[in-house]
Swiss-Prot record:
It comes from Pisum sativum (Garden pea). It is found in: Cytoplasm. GO terms for molecular function: GTP binding; GTPase activity; translation elongation factor activity. This protein promotes the GTP-dependent binding of aminoacyl-tRNA to the A-site of ribosomes during protein biosynthesis. This is Elongation factor 1-alpha. The lineage of its organism: Eukaryota, Viridiplantae, Streptophyta, Embryophyta, Tracheophyta.
Length: 447
C-alpha cells in the first residue's frame, strides 16, 4: 500500500459565470468521488430534460439541492484523488455565505484554483472593478492561501477556438492584478482548459498543442505539501456540546492546532473552566490522540452541559492555554459596506466558531492594501476598498489569537446588515488573566 497520501484542501474561486461548477464537477467526475450509479441517474434525468449539454453543472446543482435538503452524499462528492494527494474541494463560491465560510470555514485552503472565463466579454466582466474575481483573489491572499493555480477556462469558445493569442492576453492581464493583490504570478501556473470539453484537465489536449505547461491535474500534483500545526499548543474551538446518557458531557469541535488526548488537562476559555479529558473519538472510534484537522467528540469529567457552549476554545492547561481577550488590533479590509466606518462601529465578528459583537474602538491607521505601508494616521473613517489597522474591544468574553501564531483563530469576517462587510486578520492581542475560574475535582487532583 505504501504511505498514505496527504490530504489537501482546495478552494475554487472566480466570477459567477466562469465555469467553476462545470470544471469542479468534471475533475471530480474523472478522478473520483462520485459513485458511477449516481452519475448515471443524474445523466438520465438530464437527458429527459434535454439538459445534456449542461450535464456537469446540472450534476452540481443537483448535488447542491441534495446538500440543502441535508442529504449527506455531498461530502464524498467533493473529494478526488491525484497521483500525490487526496483532495477535498471546500465550499466553492456562489454560495451566499461563501466569504463567511472561507474565513470561519472548517479549514484553511491549501491552494486556490482561480477559474477565468476566457471568452470575449466573459473575461472582461469577471475582471471588471465590480467583478468577483478580484474580490475572491484578494480574500484568498488576505486569509493566507499562499498557493494558486489559474485556469483559463472556456478555451473551446474563444474566437478563434483555442486561441493562443487570447490565452496570452489573459495571462498578462490576470498576472498584473494578482501581483497587485500580493501574489507572485511567476509562481502561478496558468493552464488553458475547457471544463466542459475536458481539454487539459486530466490529459494533454491536442487542441492546445501550442501550450507546453502542466495540465490541471499536473498543477494540482505540484502543490507544495502543507505543514500541519500539530507541534503548536492545542486550540480546539467548540462547535457544539451534547449530553450523552451513560457517558456525560461531550463537547464537539475541530482540532485547529496541537493535539488532544485522553488524560490531558484542558482549560476552556474565555470562562477558564479546567477539567480532564476522559476519552476522544472520531467517527465513533476511540483515538489515542487527535491531530489538526480532526473533527472530534471528547468526553470531559465533572462538567455540566450548561457550563460549555459553542465559541469556547479548549486548550492544554499546561501549554500556553487560551485566554479571554481584553482587546486586539487587526488589519481589516472593508469589502462591502454602503457607508463609512468610524470609531464606535459595533458589528458582529465571526471568528472560528464564535459570533460576538465587537466595538471598533480606534481606527489607528489607514494602510496600503498591497504593501501594508501606512497612508494616514488616525483616519476619521474607512470605506469600501480601504484597509486599516483597528483596535477592537469585544462586548462579551471572547477568545482570539494572532493570525501569525494560530491562523484559524486569527482571521475573521465582520458581519452587519446580514452580510459580510469586511474581513480581517489579527496582529496582536491583549489578554486578560483568568481570575477565580472553576477547576473540577478531577483536574485539581491532576495538577
Amino acid at each position: 500500500m505504501g504511505k498514505e497520501k496527504v490530504h489537501i484542501n482546495i478552494v475554487v474561486i472566480g466570477h459567477v459565470d466562469s465555469g467553476k461548477s462545470t470544471t469542479t464537477v468534471h475533475v471530480i467526475y474523472k478522478l473520483g468521488g462520485i459513485d458511477k450509479r449516481v452519475i448515471e441517474r443524474f445523466e438520465k434525468e438530464a437527458d429527459e430534460m434535454n439538459k445534456r449539454s449542461f450535464k456537469y453543472a446540472w450534476l452540481l446543482d443537483k448535488l447542491k439541492a441534495e446538500r440543502e435538503r441535508g442529504i449527506t452524499i455531498d461530502i464524498a462528492l467533493l473529494k478526488f484523488e491525484t497521483t500525490k494527494y487526496y483532495s477535498t474541494v471546500m465550499d466553492a463560491p456562489g454560495h451566499r455565505d461563501f466569504i463567511k465560510n472561507m474565513i470561519t470555514g472548517t479549514s484553511q485552503a491549501d491552494c486556490a484554483v482561480l477559474i477565468i472565463d476566457s471568452t470575449t466579454g466573459g473575461f472582461e466582466a469577471g475582471i471588471s472593478k465590480d467583478g468577483q474575481t478580484r474580490e475572491h483573489a484578494l480574500l484568498a491572499f488576505t486569509l493566507g492561501v499562499k498557493q494558486m493555480i489559474c485556469c483559463c477556462n472556456k478555451m473551446d469558445a474563444t474566437t478563434p477556438k483555442y486561441s493562443k493569442g487570447r490565452y496570452e492576453e489573459i495571462v498578462k492581464e490576470v498576472s498584473s492584478y494578482l501581483k497587485e493583490v500580493g501574489y507572485n504570478p511567476d509562481k502561478i501556473p496558468f493552464v488553458p482548459i475547457s471544463g466542459f470539453e475536458g481539454d487539459n484537465m486530466i490529459e494533454r489536449s491536442t487542441n492546445l498543442d501550442w501550450y507546453k505547461g502542466p495540465t490541471l491535474l499536473d498543477a494540482l500534483d505540484n502543490i507544495n505539501e502543507p505543514k500541519r500545526p500539530s507541534d503548536k499548543p492545542l486550540r480546539l474551538p467548540l462547535q457544539d456540546v451534547y449530553k450523552i446518557g451513560g457517558i456525560g458531557t461531550v463537547p464537539v469541535g475541530r482540532v485547529e492546532t496541537g493535539v488532544v488526548k485522553p488524560g490531558m488537562l484542558v482549560t476552556f476559555a474565555p470562562t477558564g473552566l479546567t477539567t480532564e479529558v476522559k476519552s476522544v473519538e472520531m467517527h465513533h472510534e476511540a483515538l489515542t490522540e487527535a491531530l489538526p484537522g480532526d473533527n472530534v467528540r471528547f468526553n470531559v469529567k465533572n462538567v455540566a452541559v450548561k457550563d460549555l457552549k459553542h465559541g469556547l476554545v479548549a486548550s492544554n492547561s499546561k501549554d500556553d492555554p487560551a485566554k479571554d481577550a481584553a482587546n486586539f488590533t487587526s488589519q481589516v479590509i472593508i469589502m462591502n459596506h454602503p457607508g463609512q466606518i468610524g470609531n464606535g462601529y459595533a458589528p458582529v465578528l465571526d471568528c472560528h466558531t464564535s459570533h460576538i459583537a465587537v466595538k471598533f474602538a480606534e481606527l489607528i491607521t489607514k494602510i496600503d492594501r498591497r504593501s501594508g505601508k501606512e497612508i494616514e494616521k488616525e483616519p476619521k473613517f474607512l470605506k469600501n476598498g480601504d484597509a486599516g489597522m483597528v483596535k477592537m474591544i469585544p462586548t462579551k468574553p471572547m477568545v482570539v489569537e494572532t493570525f501569525a501564531e494560530y491562523p484559524p483563530l486569527g482571521r475573521f469576517a465582520v458581519r452587519d446588515m446580514r452580510q459580510t462587510v469586511a474581513v480581517g486578520v489579527i496582529k496582536s492581542v491583549e489578554k486578560k488573566d483568568p481570575t477565580g475560574a472553576k477547576v473540577t475535582k478531577a483536574a485539581a487532583k491532576k495538577k
